[in-house]
Amino acid sequence: MDPISAVDAGQVRFDEVVDVVVVGLGAAGATATVAACQAGADVLSIERSTVPGGTSAGSGGLIYLGGGTPLQVACGFDDTPQNMAAFLHGALGPGVDENRIDAYCEGSCEHYDWLVSVGVPFRAAFCDEPNRESPDDAGLVFSGGEDSYPFDEAAVPVPRGHKPQYIDSAGGFLMERLGAAVAKSPARVVPDARAESLVVDDGEVVGVLVNVDDHSRAIRARGGVVLAAGGFIHNEAMVAEHCPLAHVPDAAWRIGTPNDDGRGIRMGVGAGAATTRLDVFECALPLGPPHRLARGILVNRQGRRFINEDTYTGRIGAHALRDQDGFVYMITDDVIYEPNILGLRIAFAATTPEELALDLDVPPEALARTLHDYNEAAARGSDPEFHKRAPFLRPIGVAPATGIGAIDLRVDHGAIYATFTLGGLVTDTDGAALDITGRRVRGLYAAGRTAASLAAHHYASGISLGDGTFFGRRAGRDAAMHARR
Protein backbone atom coordinates (compact mmCIF):
# COMPACT_ATOMS: atom_id res chain seq x y z
CA MET A 1 0.00 0.00 0.00
CA ASP A 2 1.24 3.46 -0.89
CA PRO A 3 0.35 5.96 1.85
CA ILE A 4 -0.83 9.41 0.82
CA SER A 5 1.59 11.66 2.67
CA ALA A 6 0.16 14.38 4.86
CA VAL A 7 1.10 17.98 4.13
CA ASP A 8 2.74 20.15 6.78
CA ALA A 9 0.55 23.04 7.90
CA GLY A 10 3.46 25.41 7.47
CA GLN A 11 3.18 24.91 3.72
CA VAL A 12 -0.56 25.57 3.59
CA ARG A 13 -2.68 28.71 3.48
CA PHE A 14 -6.13 27.75 4.71
CA ASP A 15 -9.14 28.92 2.72
CA GLU A 16 -11.69 28.10 5.40
CA VAL A 17 -11.84 27.18 9.07
CA VAL A 18 -14.48 24.90 10.62
CA ASP A 19 -14.72 22.73 13.71
CA VAL A 20 -15.04 19.32 12.05
CA VAL A 21 -14.52 18.02 8.52
CA VAL A 22 -16.21 14.73 7.58
CA VAL A 23 -14.85 12.95 4.52
CA GLY A 24 -17.52 10.74 2.94
CA LEU A 25 -21.29 10.71 3.32
CA GLY A 26 -22.31 7.11 3.54
CA ALA A 27 -23.95 5.91 6.74
CA ALA A 28 -20.83 6.43 8.88
CA GLY A 29 -20.17 9.92 7.55
CA ALA A 30 -23.81 10.97 7.80
CA THR A 31 -24.06 9.92 11.44
CA ALA A 32 -20.73 11.60 12.21
CA THR A 33 -22.04 14.78 10.61
CA VAL A 34 -25.32 14.83 12.53
CA ALA A 35 -23.67 13.91 15.84
CA ALA A 36 -21.03 16.62 15.49
CA CYS A 37 -23.73 19.18 14.75
CA GLN A 38 -25.75 18.01 17.74
CA ALA A 39 -22.65 18.61 19.86
CA GLY A 40 -22.53 22.21 18.66
CA ALA A 41 -19.82 21.98 16.02
CA ASP A 42 -19.51 23.88 12.76
CA VAL A 43 -19.30 20.96 10.31
CA LEU A 44 -18.22 20.70 6.70
CA SER A 45 -18.93 17.35 5.04
CA ILE A 46 -17.44 16.49 1.67
CA GLU A 47 -18.63 13.74 -0.63
CA ARG A 48 -16.68 12.46 -3.60
CA SER A 49 -19.80 11.55 -5.59
CA THR A 50 -22.56 13.78 -6.85
CA VAL A 51 -25.11 11.92 -4.74
CA PRO A 52 -24.24 10.87 -1.16
CA GLY A 53 -24.87 7.37 0.13
CA GLY A 54 -21.88 5.29 -0.89
CA THR A 55 -22.00 1.54 -0.41
CA SER A 56 -24.55 2.00 2.37
CA ALA A 57 -27.18 3.12 -0.13
CA GLY A 58 -26.80 -0.09 -2.13
CA SER A 59 -26.87 -2.40 0.87
CA GLY A 60 -29.71 -4.44 2.28
CA GLY A 61 -29.99 -1.96 5.13
CA LEU A 62 -29.49 -4.35 8.05
CA ILE A 63 -28.09 -2.70 11.18
CA TYR A 64 -26.72 -5.07 13.82
CA LEU A 65 -28.18 -3.95 17.15
CA GLY A 66 -29.15 -5.74 20.34
CA GLY A 67 -28.96 -5.87 24.08
CA GLY A 68 -32.72 -5.47 24.42
CA THR A 69 -33.74 -2.87 21.84
CA PRO A 70 -37.40 -1.80 21.77
CA LEU A 71 -37.76 -3.71 18.50
CA GLN A 72 -36.44 -6.91 20.05
CA VAL A 73 -38.75 -6.51 23.02
CA ALA A 74 -41.76 -5.79 20.81
CA CYS A 75 -41.05 -8.97 18.82
CA GLY A 76 -40.84 -11.05 22.00
CA PHE A 77 -37.08 -11.58 22.28
CA ASP A 78 -35.06 -11.11 25.46
CA ASP A 79 -31.50 -9.90 25.01
CA THR A 80 -28.84 -8.24 27.14
CA PRO A 81 -25.60 -6.43 26.33
CA GLN A 82 -23.72 -9.33 27.93
CA ASN A 83 -25.51 -11.92 25.78
CA MET A 84 -24.88 -9.86 22.67
CA ALA A 85 -21.20 -9.50 23.56
CA ALA A 86 -20.86 -13.23 24.22
CA PHE A 87 -22.06 -13.92 20.68
CA LEU A 88 -19.94 -11.24 19.00
CA HIS A 89 -16.74 -12.15 20.84
CA GLY A 90 -17.02 -15.65 19.40
CA ALA A 91 -18.67 -15.08 16.04
CA LEU A 92 -16.49 -12.20 14.85
CA GLY A 93 -13.18 -13.64 16.00
CA PRO A 94 -10.58 -14.67 16.58
CA GLY A 95 -8.70 -11.50 17.46
CA VAL A 96 -11.59 -9.16 18.21
CA ASP A 97 -11.13 -5.79 19.91
CA GLU A 98 -12.96 -6.61 23.13
CA ASN A 99 -13.17 -3.00 24.30
CA ARG A 100 -14.86 -1.83 21.12
CA ILE A 101 -17.27 -4.77 21.08
CA ASP A 102 -18.21 -4.21 24.71
CA ALA A 103 -18.78 -0.49 24.12
CA TYR A 104 -20.89 -1.33 21.08
CA CYS A 105 -23.04 -3.79 22.98
CA GLU A 106 -23.48 -1.52 26.01
CA GLY A 107 -24.50 1.39 23.80
CA SER A 108 -26.60 -0.51 21.28
CA CYS A 109 -30.04 0.26 22.74
CA GLU A 110 -29.23 3.95 23.04
CA HIS A 111 -27.98 3.92 19.46
CA TYR A 112 -31.26 2.37 18.30
CA ASP A 113 -33.15 5.16 20.07
CA TRP A 114 -30.91 7.75 18.42
CA LEU A 115 -31.51 6.33 14.96
CA VAL A 116 -35.25 6.48 15.54
CA SER A 117 -34.92 10.06 16.83
CA VAL A 118 -33.27 11.22 13.60
CA GLY A 119 -35.96 9.64 11.45
CA VAL A 120 -35.10 5.97 10.88
CA PRO A 121 -38.24 3.86 11.54
CA PHE A 122 -38.47 0.14 12.31
CA ARG A 123 -41.59 -2.05 12.18
CA ALA A 124 -42.06 -4.46 15.05
CA ALA A 125 -42.26 -7.70 13.07
CA PHE A 126 -39.96 -10.72 12.92
CA CYS A 127 -38.94 -12.43 9.67
CA ASP A 128 -38.14 -16.12 10.14
CA GLU A 129 -36.07 -16.41 6.94
CA PRO A 130 -32.51 -15.75 8.18
CA ASN A 131 -29.31 -14.27 6.78
CA ARG A 132 -30.79 -11.46 4.69
CA GLU A 133 -33.16 -8.54 4.90
CA SER A 134 -36.85 -9.40 4.99
CA PRO A 135 -38.74 -9.35 1.66
CA ASP A 136 -41.40 -7.16 3.28
CA ASP A 137 -40.88 -4.37 5.82
CA ALA A 138 -40.46 -6.61 8.88
CA GLY A 139 -37.80 -5.11 11.10
CA LEU A 140 -36.03 -8.03 12.80
CA VAL A 141 -34.16 -11.09 11.52
CA PHE A 142 -31.43 -13.54 12.50
CA SER A 143 -28.45 -12.22 10.55
CA GLY A 144 -25.30 -13.88 11.86
CA GLY A 145 -25.92 -17.54 12.66
CA GLU A 146 -26.94 -16.76 16.24
CA ASP A 147 -29.30 -19.75 16.23
CA SER A 148 -26.85 -22.29 14.78
CA TYR A 149 -23.82 -24.20 16.08
CA PRO A 150 -21.52 -23.29 17.76
CA PHE A 151 -22.94 -19.91 18.70
CA ASP A 152 -26.25 -21.22 19.98
CA GLU A 153 -24.23 -22.81 22.78
CA ALA A 154 -22.16 -19.70 23.60
CA ALA A 155 -25.09 -17.30 23.90
CA VAL A 156 -28.88 -17.36 23.97
CA PRO A 157 -29.94 -17.18 20.29
CA VAL A 158 -31.53 -13.79 19.62
CA PRO A 159 -32.08 -12.00 16.28
CA ARG A 160 -30.26 -8.68 15.97
CA GLY A 161 -30.53 -7.74 12.32
CA HIS A 162 -32.57 -4.51 12.45
CA LYS A 163 -33.96 -3.39 9.10
CA PRO A 164 -35.51 0.06 8.61
CA GLN A 165 -39.18 -0.07 7.68
CA TYR A 166 -39.03 -0.53 3.95
CA ILE A 167 -39.98 -3.27 1.50
CA ASP A 168 -37.04 -5.57 0.65
CA SER A 169 -33.57 -3.94 0.55
CA ALA A 170 -33.55 -0.88 2.78
CA GLY A 171 -30.08 0.62 2.31
CA GLY A 172 -31.31 3.35 -0.01
CA PHE A 173 -34.16 4.19 2.34
CA LEU A 174 -31.79 4.31 5.32
CA MET A 175 -29.59 6.79 3.47
CA GLU A 176 -32.63 8.86 2.50
CA ARG A 177 -33.48 9.20 6.18
CA LEU A 178 -29.91 9.86 7.31
CA GLY A 179 -29.47 12.26 4.40
CA ALA A 180 -32.58 14.11 5.50
CA ALA A 181 -31.13 14.37 9.01
CA VAL A 182 -27.94 15.83 7.54
CA ALA A 183 -30.00 18.29 5.47
CA LYS A 184 -31.88 19.44 8.58
CA SER A 185 -28.63 19.98 10.44
CA PRO A 186 -26.53 23.15 10.07
CA ALA A 187 -23.75 21.18 8.37
CA ARG A 188 -22.58 22.30 4.96
CA VAL A 189 -22.29 19.53 2.39
CA VAL A 190 -20.03 19.77 -0.65
CA PRO A 191 -20.60 17.05 -3.30
CA ASP A 192 -18.16 16.16 -6.07
CA ALA A 193 -15.32 16.97 -3.69
CA ARG A 194 -12.31 14.72 -3.36
CA ALA A 195 -10.09 14.73 -0.29
CA GLU A 196 -6.50 14.90 -1.51
CA SER A 197 -4.43 14.69 1.67
CA LEU A 198 -4.52 15.50 5.36
CA VAL A 199 -2.76 18.52 6.83
CA VAL A 200 -0.70 18.06 10.00
CA ASP A 201 0.92 20.38 12.50
CA ASP A 202 3.47 18.79 14.83
CA GLY A 203 1.82 15.39 14.43
CA GLU A 204 -1.75 16.63 14.86
CA VAL A 205 -4.23 16.49 12.00
CA VAL A 206 -5.49 20.06 11.61
CA GLY A 207 -7.18 19.99 8.23
CA VAL A 208 -7.54 18.52 4.78
CA LEU A 209 -6.80 19.50 1.20
CA VAL A 210 -9.89 19.12 -0.99
CA ASN A 211 -10.26 19.20 -4.75
CA VAL A 212 -13.49 20.86 -5.88
CA ASP A 213 -14.10 21.68 -9.55
CA ASP A 214 -10.43 21.02 -10.26
CA HIS A 215 -9.40 23.59 -7.68
CA SER A 216 -7.61 22.74 -4.46
CA ARG A 217 -8.93 24.20 -1.22
CA ALA A 218 -7.36 23.91 2.20
CA ILE A 219 -9.85 23.45 5.04
CA ARG A 220 -8.73 23.81 8.63
CA ALA A 221 -10.53 21.64 11.18
CA ARG A 222 -10.22 22.84 14.77
CA GLY A 223 -11.60 19.64 16.23
CA GLY A 224 -10.51 17.07 13.73
CA VAL A 225 -11.14 15.22 10.48
CA VAL A 226 -13.39 12.15 10.34
CA LEU A 227 -12.44 9.77 7.53
CA ALA A 228 -15.52 7.81 6.43
CA ALA A 229 -14.45 7.20 2.84
CA GLY A 230 -15.16 3.48 2.45
CA GLY A 231 -13.00 0.38 2.14
CA PHE A 232 -10.68 -0.82 -0.63
CA ILE A 233 -12.42 -3.65 -2.46
CA HIS A 234 -12.07 -1.72 -5.75
CA ASN A 235 -8.38 -0.96 -5.36
CA GLU A 236 -6.94 -3.91 -7.24
CA ALA A 237 -3.38 -3.27 -6.08
CA MET A 238 -4.36 -3.17 -2.40
CA VAL A 239 -6.56 -6.25 -2.74
CA ALA A 240 -3.77 -8.13 -4.53
CA GLU A 241 -1.33 -7.16 -1.79
CA HIS A 242 -3.48 -7.84 1.24
CA CYS A 243 -6.45 -10.11 0.44
CA PRO A 244 -6.15 -11.53 -3.09
CA LEU A 245 -8.92 -14.10 -2.59
CA ALA A 246 -11.40 -11.23 -2.25
CA HIS A 247 -10.86 -10.49 -5.94
CA VAL A 248 -13.62 -12.87 -7.04
CA PRO A 249 -14.11 -13.48 -10.79
CA ASP A 250 -17.40 -11.58 -11.07
CA ALA A 251 -16.65 -7.90 -10.36
CA ALA A 252 -20.34 -7.29 -9.69
CA TRP A 253 -19.96 -9.25 -6.45
CA ARG A 254 -17.06 -7.17 -5.14
CA ILE A 255 -19.41 -5.16 -2.98
CA GLY A 256 -18.84 -1.43 -3.01
CA THR A 257 -18.74 1.61 -5.22
CA PRO A 258 -15.76 2.62 -7.39
CA ASN A 259 -14.87 5.02 -4.58
CA ASP A 260 -14.12 2.08 -2.28
CA ASP A 261 -10.53 2.46 -3.42
CA GLY A 262 -8.73 2.74 -0.09
CA ARG A 263 -8.05 6.45 -0.36
CA GLY A 264 -9.22 7.22 3.18
CA ILE A 265 -7.06 4.44 4.59
CA ARG A 266 -4.02 5.62 2.65
CA MET A 267 -4.57 9.21 3.84
CA GLY A 268 -4.80 8.03 7.43
CA VAL A 269 -1.59 6.03 7.16
CA GLY A 270 0.12 9.06 5.64
CA ALA A 271 -0.76 11.01 8.78
CA GLY A 272 0.61 8.38 11.15
CA ALA A 273 -2.36 6.07 11.74
CA ALA A 274 -1.87 2.32 12.01
CA THR A 275 -3.82 -0.31 10.10
CA THR A 276 -4.94 -3.76 11.11
CA ARG A 277 -6.37 -6.89 9.48
CA LEU A 278 -6.10 -5.68 5.90
CA ASP A 279 -6.09 -9.36 4.95
CA VAL A 280 -9.60 -9.92 6.34
CA PHE A 281 -12.69 -9.76 4.15
CA GLU A 282 -16.28 -10.90 4.17
CA CYS A 283 -17.43 -13.49 1.66
CA ALA A 284 -21.10 -14.44 1.51
CA LEU A 285 -22.18 -17.58 -0.33
CA PRO A 286 -25.99 -17.30 -0.28
CA LEU A 287 -27.95 -20.54 -0.44
CA GLY A 288 -31.46 -19.14 -0.45
CA PRO A 289 -34.04 -18.24 0.48
CA PRO A 290 -35.58 -20.58 1.23
CA HIS A 291 -33.27 -21.58 4.04
CA ARG A 292 -34.63 -25.12 3.63
CA LEU A 293 -31.97 -25.65 0.96
CA ALA A 294 -29.66 -26.20 3.94
CA ARG A 295 -31.14 -29.72 4.13
CA GLY A 296 -28.53 -30.55 1.51
CA ILE A 297 -24.87 -30.97 2.40
CA LEU A 298 -21.84 -28.99 1.23
CA VAL A 299 -18.80 -30.98 0.10
CA ASN A 300 -15.30 -29.95 -0.91
CA ARG A 301 -12.75 -31.25 -3.40
CA GLN A 302 -12.16 -34.29 -1.18
CA GLY A 303 -15.86 -35.17 -1.22
CA ARG A 304 -16.20 -34.32 2.47
CA ARG A 305 -18.38 -31.93 4.43
CA PHE A 306 -16.66 -28.95 6.04
CA ILE A 307 -19.37 -26.95 7.86
CA ASN A 308 -22.92 -27.09 9.22
CA GLU A 309 -25.04 -25.99 6.29
CA ASP A 310 -27.65 -24.20 8.42
CA THR A 311 -25.19 -21.56 9.64
CA TYR A 312 -24.79 -17.97 8.46
CA THR A 313 -24.09 -17.70 4.73
CA GLY A 314 -21.18 -15.34 5.36
CA ARG A 315 -19.54 -17.99 7.47
CA ILE A 316 -20.15 -20.59 4.77
CA GLY A 317 -18.71 -18.30 2.11
CA ALA A 318 -15.62 -17.47 4.13
CA HIS A 319 -14.85 -21.14 4.74
CA ALA A 320 -15.66 -22.07 1.14
CA LEU A 321 -13.38 -19.46 -0.41
CA ARG A 322 -10.56 -19.25 2.14
CA ASP A 323 -10.32 -22.88 3.18
CA GLN A 324 -11.75 -24.81 0.23
CA ASP A 325 -10.41 -22.65 -2.63
CA GLY A 326 -13.94 -22.02 -3.83
CA PHE A 327 -14.43 -25.67 -4.82
CA VAL A 328 -17.82 -26.53 -3.32
CA TYR A 329 -20.91 -28.48 -4.32
CA MET A 330 -24.21 -28.84 -2.52
CA ILE A 331 -25.41 -32.45 -2.59
CA THR A 332 -29.19 -32.71 -2.63
CA ASP A 333 -31.99 -34.70 -4.25
CA ASP A 334 -35.25 -34.13 -6.09
CA VAL A 335 -37.26 -34.14 -2.85
CA ILE A 336 -35.09 -31.84 -0.76
CA TYR A 337 -34.35 -29.41 -3.59
CA GLU A 338 -36.84 -26.65 -4.30
CA PRO A 339 -36.92 -23.48 -6.40
CA ASN A 340 -35.15 -20.58 -4.77
CA ILE A 341 -34.70 -16.84 -5.11
CA LEU A 342 -31.18 -17.22 -6.52
CA GLY A 343 -32.13 -19.64 -9.28
CA LEU A 344 -29.73 -22.31 -8.00
CA ARG A 345 -30.34 -25.50 -9.96
CA ILE A 346 -29.23 -29.11 -9.84
CA ALA A 347 -26.41 -29.17 -12.38
CA PHE A 348 -25.48 -32.86 -12.08
CA ALA A 349 -27.69 -35.87 -11.30
CA ALA A 350 -27.01 -39.57 -10.80
CA THR A 351 -28.45 -42.65 -9.17
CA THR A 352 -25.50 -43.32 -6.85
CA PRO A 353 -22.87 -41.21 -5.04
CA GLU A 354 -20.11 -42.98 -6.96
CA GLU A 355 -21.63 -42.00 -10.31
CA LEU A 356 -22.17 -38.42 -9.16
CA ALA A 357 -18.59 -38.16 -7.90
CA LEU A 358 -17.24 -38.84 -11.39
CA ASP A 359 -19.14 -35.82 -12.72
CA LEU A 360 -17.93 -33.64 -9.85
CA ASP A 361 -14.30 -34.77 -10.03
CA VAL A 362 -14.23 -35.78 -6.37
CA PRO A 363 -13.16 -39.16 -4.93
CA PRO A 364 -16.08 -41.61 -5.36
CA GLU A 365 -15.37 -43.61 -2.21
CA ALA A 366 -15.09 -40.44 -0.12
CA LEU A 367 -18.37 -39.00 -1.38
CA ALA A 368 -20.14 -42.32 -0.86
CA ARG A 369 -18.81 -42.51 2.72
CA THR A 370 -19.84 -38.91 3.38
CA LEU A 371 -23.40 -39.61 2.21
CA HIS A 372 -23.60 -42.88 4.11
CA ASP A 373 -22.45 -41.38 7.41
CA TYR A 374 -24.62 -38.29 7.04
CA ASN A 375 -27.75 -40.24 6.10
CA GLU A 376 -27.29 -42.69 8.93
CA ALA A 377 -27.06 -39.87 11.48
CA ALA A 378 -29.79 -37.77 9.85
CA ALA A 379 -32.20 -40.70 10.06
CA ARG A 380 -31.65 -40.57 13.82
CA GLY A 381 -32.18 -36.79 13.86
CA SER A 382 -28.58 -35.97 14.75
CA ASP A 383 -25.41 -34.56 13.19
CA PRO A 384 -22.53 -35.46 15.50
CA GLU A 385 -19.89 -34.16 13.08
CA PHE A 386 -21.13 -30.61 12.42
CA HIS A 387 -24.23 -30.23 14.63
CA LYS A 388 -26.72 -29.11 12.03
CA ARG A 389 -30.12 -28.54 13.63
CA ALA A 390 -32.85 -31.17 13.44
CA PRO A 391 -35.22 -29.25 11.09
CA PHE A 392 -32.49 -29.35 8.44
CA LEU A 393 -31.62 -33.03 8.80
CA ARG A 394 -33.01 -35.37 6.18
CA PRO A 395 -31.39 -38.37 4.49
CA ILE A 396 -30.35 -37.56 0.94
CA GLY A 397 -31.04 -39.78 -2.06
CA VAL A 398 -33.40 -42.21 -0.32
CA ALA A 399 -37.03 -42.92 -1.23
CA PRO A 400 -39.13 -41.15 -2.28
CA ALA A 401 -36.15 -39.41 -3.94
CA THR A 402 -35.22 -40.96 -7.28
CA GLY A 403 -31.49 -40.24 -7.03
CA ILE A 404 -29.05 -37.57 -5.94
CA GLY A 405 -27.81 -34.37 -7.51
CA ALA A 406 -25.38 -31.51 -7.05
CA ILE A 407 -25.70 -27.74 -7.19
CA ASP A 408 -22.49 -26.25 -8.56
CA LEU A 409 -21.18 -23.67 -6.09
CA ARG A 410 -17.65 -23.37 -7.42
CA VAL A 411 -16.35 -19.81 -7.41
CA ASP A 412 -15.25 -19.96 -11.04
CA HIS A 413 -18.50 -21.48 -12.30
CA GLY A 414 -20.95 -18.65 -11.66
CA ALA A 415 -21.82 -19.10 -7.99
CA ILE A 416 -22.26 -15.90 -5.98
CA TYR A 417 -19.29 -15.15 -3.76
CA ALA A 418 -19.93 -11.60 -2.51
CA THR A 419 -16.86 -9.95 -0.98
CA PHE A 420 -15.88 -6.71 0.69
CA THR A 421 -12.96 -5.64 2.86
CA LEU A 422 -13.02 -5.49 6.66
CA GLY A 423 -9.54 -4.21 7.51
CA GLY A 424 -8.66 -0.55 7.93
CA LEU A 425 -7.37 2.06 10.32
CA VAL A 426 -7.02 1.17 14.00
CA THR A 427 -9.47 3.15 16.13
CA ASP A 428 -10.56 3.32 19.77
CA THR A 429 -14.03 3.32 21.30
CA ASP A 430 -14.54 6.97 20.29
CA GLY A 431 -13.52 6.43 16.67
CA ALA A 432 -10.17 8.15 17.15
CA ALA A 433 -7.38 6.80 14.94
CA LEU A 434 -4.43 5.21 16.72
CA ASP A 435 -0.77 4.95 15.76
CA ILE A 436 1.36 1.81 15.96
CA THR A 437 2.04 2.44 19.67
CA GLY A 438 -1.68 2.62 20.47
CA ARG A 439 -1.67 6.37 21.03
CA ARG A 440 -4.22 8.64 19.41
CA VAL A 441 -3.28 10.48 16.25
CA ARG A 442 -4.54 13.83 17.46
CA GLY A 443 -7.30 15.28 15.33
CA LEU A 444 -7.89 12.14 13.25
CA TYR A 445 -10.93 9.88 13.35
CA ALA A 446 -12.17 7.04 11.16
CA ALA A 447 -15.43 5.13 10.81
CA GLY A 448 -17.21 2.77 8.45
CA ARG A 449 -14.99 0.64 6.23
CA THR A 450 -12.16 3.16 6.43
CA ALA A 451 -11.75 1.89 10.00
CA ALA A 452 -11.07 -1.74 10.84
CA SER A 453 -14.39 -3.49 11.41
CA LEU A 454 -15.53 -5.08 14.64
CA ALA A 455 -15.49 -8.22 12.50
CA ALA A 456 -11.90 -9.33 13.10
CA HIS A 457 -12.08 -12.58 11.13
CA HIS A 458 -15.71 -13.51 10.50
CA TYR A 459 -18.75 -11.35 9.86
CA ALA A 460 -22.43 -11.03 10.73
CA SER A 461 -24.80 -9.16 8.45
CA GLY A 462 -25.50 -5.67 9.77
CA ILE A 463 -22.11 -5.18 11.41
CA SER A 464 -20.93 -2.72 8.74
CA LEU A 465 -23.91 -0.40 9.13
CA GLY A 466 -23.96 -1.11 12.86
CA ASP A 467 -20.41 -0.25 13.79
CA GLY A 468 -20.20 2.37 11.04
CA THR A 469 -23.11 4.39 12.40
CA PHE A 470 -22.27 3.71 16.06
CA PHE A 471 -18.62 4.71 15.91
CA GLY A 472 -19.34 7.36 13.29
CA ARG A 473 -21.56 9.07 15.86
CA ARG A 474 -18.89 8.78 18.50
CA ALA A 475 -16.22 10.12 16.18
CA GLY A 476 -18.30 13.14 15.22
CA ARG A 477 -19.15 13.89 18.83
CA ASP A 478 -15.57 13.49 20.06
CA ALA A 479 -14.20 15.70 17.28
CA ALA A 480 -16.77 18.36 18.17
CA MET A 481 -15.72 18.22 21.81
CA HIS A 482 -12.07 18.47 20.78
CA ALA A 483 -12.84 21.69 18.88
CA ARG A 484 -13.92 23.33 22.15
CA ARG A 485 -10.82 22.30 24.12
Language model segments and positions:
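Glycine-rich FAD pyrophosphate-binding loop
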Residues: Q38-S59
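Conserved redox-cofactor binding core of oxidoreductases
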Residues: A103-S216, E236-A237, L371, A378-G405
